[in-house]
């Protein structure tokens, strides 16, 4: 029997938390709330804007580091990100290892006019309707957390609700699975969720094998404009940044620096 990985531990907690929420609000009730929510914003259009986009993340903690920042007002932080030029705001909602919550998602959705990504470990259809009910326009699906049948089903359900799925991969094999499932937006995570180790070369190995019509997002490992430019040179359409922003003294300026680099004439252009 293989030893449990970090991802296994996270998923076990997520399943328990989803079951607890569903015991309070049924699947039929959350579906009704999702249907009654305002229509989702066009996250795909935001990702296709010229230059390298910045997805800025509201992130309180991580399994690898622990607490990252005390975020007293997630809405204020999200507004700073938007003011800095972020195209999409990502909100971590996993409770046990990332200290996130749906309350953070609600606060951010009410505060910004750009699309919002719910970043969590989706293992049940309930979470997809829950994301839409709380105003998400985009949803993370992690290939390593789902078998192929579940991945395809979750992707179809996400798109049926008008959201865009950010399908996260770590290996060439996972990228193949994402493509076979029909992913239109693929994120390559430099951090291995099994071990929490970071490999910034992961993106440059996987991105060349992705079709040009697929949006490519580099996740993790962005510490500043130099990293954004390196990812752009490897074919990124956008970068997702969390830790570097929440730990900066001026998140608006930190986002603006990345946006400036991503839209500068010397920045490599996405191959579309």
UniProtKB/Swiss-Prot annotation:
EC number: 4.1.1.48
GO molecular function: indole-3-glycerol-phosphate synthase activity; phosphoribosylanthranilate isomerase activity
CDD domains: IGPS (cd00331)
Keywords of the record: Amino-acid biosynthesis, Aromatic amino acid biosynthesis, Decarboxylase, Lyase, Tryptophan biosynthesis
GO biological process, one term: L-tryptophan biosynthetic process
PROSITE patterns, A to Z: IGPS
KW Amino-acid biosynthesis (keyword) present: yes
Pathway: Amino-acid biosynthesis; L-tryptophan biosynthesis; L-tryptophan from chorismate: step 4/5
Catalytic activity: 1-(2-carboxyphenylamino)-1-deoxy-D-ribulose 5-phosphate + H(+) = (1S,2R)-1-C-(indol-3-yl)glycerol 3-phosphate + CO2 + H2O
Enzyme class: lyase
Family as reported in the entry's similarity comment: Belongs to the TrpC family.
Protein name (record): Indole-3-glycerol phosphate synthase
Originating species: Mycobacterium leprae (strain TN)
Lineage: Bacteria, Bacillati, Actinomycetota, Actinomycetes, Mycobacteriales
Gene that this sequence comes from: trpC
């Amino acid at each position: 029997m293989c030893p449990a990985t970090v991802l296994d531990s996270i998923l076990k907690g997520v399943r328990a938390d989803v079951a607890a929420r569903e015991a309070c609000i049924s699947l039929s009730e959350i579906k009704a709330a999702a249907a009654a929510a305002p229509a989702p914003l066009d996250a795909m259009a935001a990702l296709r804007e010229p230059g390298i986009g910045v997805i800025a993340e509201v992130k309180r903690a991580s399994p690898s580091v622990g607490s990252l920042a005390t975020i007293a007002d997630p809405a204020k932080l999200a507004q700073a990100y938007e003011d800095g030029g972020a195209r999409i705001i990502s909100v971590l909602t996993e409770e046990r290892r990332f200290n996130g919550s749906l309350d953070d998602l609600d606060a951010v959705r009410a505060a910004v006019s750009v699309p919002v990504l719910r970043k969590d470990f989706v293992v049940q259809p309930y979470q997809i309707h829950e994301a839409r009910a709380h105003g998400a326009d985009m949803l993370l699906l992690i290939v390593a957390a789902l078998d192929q049948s579940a991945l395809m089903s979750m992707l179809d359900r996400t798109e049926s609700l008008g959201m865009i799925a950010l399908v996260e991969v770590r290996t060439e094999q996972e990228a193949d699975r994402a493509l076979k499932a029909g992913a239109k937006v693929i994120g390559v995570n430099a951090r291995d969720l099994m071990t929490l180790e970071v490999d910034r070369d992961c993106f440059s190995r996987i991105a060349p094998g992705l079709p040009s019509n697929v949006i490519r997002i580099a996740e993790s490992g962005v510490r500043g404009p130099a990293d954004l430019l390196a990812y752009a040179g490897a074919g990124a359409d956008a970068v997702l940044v969390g830790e570097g922003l929440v730990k900066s003294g001026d998140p608006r300026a930190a986002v603006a620096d990345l946006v400036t680099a991503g839209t500068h004439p010397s920045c490599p252009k996405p191959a579309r």
